């Protein structure tokens, strides 16, 4: 599955904080945050997730370049899960780093949102 930039692909961010790139792969919106997701930076991830307008949205959040995530990031992922599933879509998490996976497991978000070890598995049907 080749990954290609979405027509509305964008990158938002600030140096030393968080940047977010959005692409598309086989009709699936892929959100690539890079950096730390915390109270000060989480708005960028929220903005990327709030732009989902498709019926039955399919979303993968690639966490492979996220070095830290606090409860702000967890809350955004849970809200996105609720919004996407209410629209008959799905959201998956891909390739969380060890510290991020630990947080997801501690608060049991990985029981709510499917978490895959790499992006290719998260994109698979």
Please give the residue ranges for each predicted region.
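STAS-typified acidic loop motif
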Residues: 4-6, 10-47
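Intrinsic-disorder/low-complexity coil detector
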Residues: 4-6, 14, 32, 56, ...
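General small-molecule cofactor/ligand-binding pocket signal
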Residues: 21-23, 94, 116
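Conserved catalytic submotifs in the C-terminal HATPase_c
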Residues: 25-26, 64, 96, 120
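Glycine-centered tight turns that cap/initiate beta-strands
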Residues: 27, 109-112, 118
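Amphipathic alpha-helical interaction surfaces in cytosolic regulatory modules
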Residues: 39-113
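A charged, well-structured terminal subsegment
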Residues: 117-125
């Amino acid at each position: 599955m080749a990954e290609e930039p979405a027509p509305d692909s964008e990158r938002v961010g600030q140096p030393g904080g968080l940047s977010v790139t959005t692409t598309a792969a086989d009709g699936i919106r892929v959100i690539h945050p890079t950096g730390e997701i915390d109270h000060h930076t989480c708005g960028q991830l929220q903005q990327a997730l709030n732009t989902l307008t498709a019926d039955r949205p399919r979303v993968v959040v690639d966490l492979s370049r996220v070095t830290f995530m606090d409860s702000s990031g967890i809350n955004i992922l849970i809200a996105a899960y609720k919004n996407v599933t209410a629209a008959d879509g799905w959201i998956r998490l891909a390739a969380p780093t060890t510290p991020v996976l630990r947080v997801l497991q501690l608060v049991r978000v990985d029981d709510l949102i499917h978490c895959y070890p790499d992006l290719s598995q998260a994109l698979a049907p």
